[in-house]
Amino acid sequence: MKNFTLLLCIFIITHFALAQTETNTSFASQMNTMFSPLDKNNVPQGILLDYGMEFTNVPAFNGTLTDSTYTNLTAFKQIYNTLLSSRIRDVTTGFVTPQTFDTNLKYSRTTNVITLGGLYFKYATFIDNATVNGKLTYSGGKFYDKYTNGVWQNPYQERKTFVLAATEKIHKGFNIQVKLPSSIFYSNVLSEVQSIEIDFGNGQGYVTVPFNQIVNVSYTSEGVKTWTYKLNLTSSASLYSRSRIKIEEGLTTIPWSERHGNQN
């Protein structure tokens, strides 16, 4: 009976994986057909959100803080996978395979250190009402570039997305070590990043967090803390992101003399 149950589980998992693969392949095939007439070299960064499979609302994470855009590890992965699937031409800068993404995340973690992962990307979308406004043609289930008097009409809007998130939701102890490994911060415009600052919600304000360096953070109380991330760009602009982490009091070590009294 146990063997049958095991085989059944393996069958279900395999069937689900194959079904998911077939769905992804079918979607990609449809998108390739629909967008095939377009000149892909005109797409900013070679990433078109309208072309990809959207796992989450990427434009919402545009560097402006809102109540609905707190980040976590799941949101980070969903945004990355959406951008990965939105590559309309062969661009590789800032990207790794989903398998490498998970591997990097796994091996970047260190005992007693909270690691952060994130991304900063530029990508494109169709402008609103592009077909109505004469910027794009849609005919026979396909998109076509629009030309007016021989002049190409630009239907694209370049956008930015920035997220950072801790790999843990709960931490025990008031003294924390935090690290942002460069191996799990992805960007197709990394040269635009000047610095990253974090307000850990402990009353100390923003502190600069360099890649691959330990930053010590202290709290005086338990509770859910909001970590606010600030991405400073070389253009002098700043983008923001934030996440939550629950801080719990850790074990308190009592000196031997206090536990057993004065032996003198």
Segments predicted by a language model, with ranges:
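Bacterial Sec-dependent N-terminal signal peptides
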Residues: 1-22
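Extracellular/lumenal mature domains of secreted and surface-exposed proteins
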Residues: 20-264
